[in-house]
Amino acid sequence: MARIAGVDIPNDKRVVISLTYVYGIGLATSKKILAAAGVSEDIRVKDLTSDQEDAIRREVDTIKVEGDLRREVNLNIKRLMEIGSYRGIRHRRGLPVRGQNTKNNARTRKGKAVAIAGKKK
């Protein structure tokens, strides 16, 4: 397994797919990285030469991925919560942030439904 940005990428898959195992690299970014590194998208990871691996690593190092990206996203959310914006309040309360309705659904964000005790007979 080749190690790129601290992540072991699978050997048996094509390079363009294997790169998407790194947090912050999707299919489009993966294709851009390979084009800049001059590596074919169809080659398998196990068939890469060490020079090609190094070229891919250099290109990945120019992009914010893994820990740095996660930290930036968390700091952005924390900043929204500190300034008290609407989005920050929704994050703090654990509700949907992007305008979805919460009357019926939103179970993923709100968590498991808590039963309210009904009237006893």
From Swiss-Prot:
Family matches, as Gene3D superfamilies: 1.10.8.50, 30s ribosomal protein s13, domain 2
Ranges where the record places region Disordered: 95-121
UniProt lineage: Bacteria, Bacillati, Bacillota, Bacilli, Lactobacillales
UniProt entry keywords in alphabetical sequence: Ribonucleoprotein, Ribosomal protein, RNA-binding, rRNA-binding, tRNA-binding
BP GO annotations: translation
Record protein name field: Small ribosomal subunit protein uS13
PROSITE patterns assigned to the protein according to its UniProt record, in alphabetical order: RIBOSOMAL_S13_1 (PS00646), RIBOSOMAL_S13_2 (PS50159)
PANTHER family assigned to the protein according to its UniProt record, in alphabetical order: 30S RIBOSOMAL PROTEIN S13/40S RIBOSOMAL PROTEIN S18, SMALL RIBOSOMAL SUBUNIT PROTEIN US13M
One GO CC term, this protein: small ribosomal subunit
Function summary: Located at the top of the head of the 30S subunit, it contacts several helices of the 16S rRNA. In the 70S ribosome it contacts the 23S rRNA (bridge B1a) and protein L5 of the 50S subunit (bridge B1b), connecting the 2 subunits; these bridges are implicated in subunit movement. Contacts the tRNAs in the A and P-sites.
Organism: Streptococcus equi subsp. zooepidemicus (strain MGCS10565)
Subunit organization: Part of the 30S ribosomal subunit. Forms a loose heterodimer with protein S19. Forms two bridges to the 50S subunit in the 70S ribosome.
Pfam families: Ribosomal_S13
GO MF annotations, alphabetized: rRNA binding; structural constituent of ribosome; tRNA binding
Gene: rpsM
